[in-house]
C-alpha cells in the first residue's frame, strides 16, 4: 500500500477530473489518498464540500493552522504520515518534502504538461 499526497489549489482545482479518476483508482487498489492543503482549518466545511463537488474521494484531509509555513507544514504531514508520492503545484513545497518522497510537479507556466498519467500509474503500481 502506498500513501499518496495531493494538494488542492493549483493541483486538484486545475484538473479535477484527472485527480478524481486517480484518487478513485488508488483507493480501489487499497492505497491511501491524503489531501494535504495549506487552506486553514476554518475552511474545512467549505473544502469538504468542494472535494465532494469535484468527486474526489480521500482517506484523510490535512489542513494548516494559521501559524504554519506552507512548505514546512506539508513536509511535516508527509513525514508524519509516511507519504510515498506527492502531487503539488508548488515547487517550494515539493523541495521541502522528506527524502524518499516521489514528487510530481503539477504546474509550471512554461511547461504544457507534466508526467504522463501512464508513467504515474506505472510508478504507483510498482512494488505492490
Residue ranges and their predicted role:
Residues 44-128:
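C-terminal cap/substrate-recognition subdomain and adjoining C-terminal extension
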Residues 2-69:
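Alpha-helical substrate-recognition element adjacent to the catalytic core
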Residues 1-3, 82-83:
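Hydrophobic/aromatic side chains embedded in well-ordered alpha-helices
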